[in-house]
């Protein structure tokens, strides 16, 4: 139910949202489908869309400035790992690219085929970046005898709540994988 809501944000993969919007009694309900790809550029684009609907553009610009500052600090910490060869889960691509990793192969979600695993190993990765919520690629790291890390693309793990938390968490996991 959307009773009492003024705005509904959704990612587009929630099958029930269009029907709920259509049948809502609240005819003044604003809805906005957003792209949930966790890259800094996309997150800022989506924040701007939301701010426009909520008439909070000034607050969004202030947040964006803080966010960019924090990202810059995190990238300094990640700079020693820039250019490392990485086999990356599809949903970890935005973070991996932002972190400066050299993505040599992208692993799709779902079951891996023997050919896909062999191809990934042949790329001689320094690291496999998997997604915590749908991990599939540990077998590649084990067989390639390289480092392995799981990252997140939405908050929840270890008290992550904000967009900044996602980047803090993922950055710390990447650094730990090389210790």
Model-derived regions: residue spans:
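Acidic/His-rich segments in extracytoplasmic proteins that coordinate ligands and/or metal ions
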Residues: 1-53, 134-147
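Alpha-helix C-terminal capping/helix-to-coil transition sites in glycosyltransferase folds
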Residues: 3-4, 122-124
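Structured C-terminal subdomain patch of bacterial secreted/periplasmic proteins
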Residues: 41-43, 47-48, 123, 127-179
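Solvent-exposed, acidic/flexible segments
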Residues: 13-14, 36-43, 60, 85-89, ...
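Periplasmic-binding protein-like
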Residues: 7-11, 87, 126-132
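Short, solvent-exposed amphipathic alpha-helices that sit
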Residues: 42-46, 87-100
């Amino acid at each position: 139910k959307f009773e009492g809501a003024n705005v509904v944000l959704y990612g587009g993969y929630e099958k029930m949202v269009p029907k709920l919007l259509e049948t809502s009694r609240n005819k003044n309900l604003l809805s906005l489908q957003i792209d949930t790809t966790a890259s800094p550029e996309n997150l800022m684009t989506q924040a701007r869309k939301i701010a426009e609907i909520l008439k909070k553009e000034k607050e969004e610009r202030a947040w964006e400035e803080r966010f960019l500052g924090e990202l810059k600090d995190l990238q300094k910490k990640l700079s020693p790992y820039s250019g490392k060869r990485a086999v990356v889960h599809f949903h970890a691509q935005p973070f991996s690219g932002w972190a400066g990793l050299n993505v040599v192969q992208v692993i799709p979600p779902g079951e891996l085929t023997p050919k896909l695993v062999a191809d990934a190993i042949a790329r001689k990765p320094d690291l496999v970046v998997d997604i915590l919520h749908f991990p599939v690629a540990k077998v590649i790291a084990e067989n390639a005898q390289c480092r392995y890390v799981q990252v997140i693309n939405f908050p929840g793990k270890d008290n992550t709540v904000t967009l900044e938390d996602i980047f803090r968490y993922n950055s710390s996991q990447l650094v730990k994988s090389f210790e």
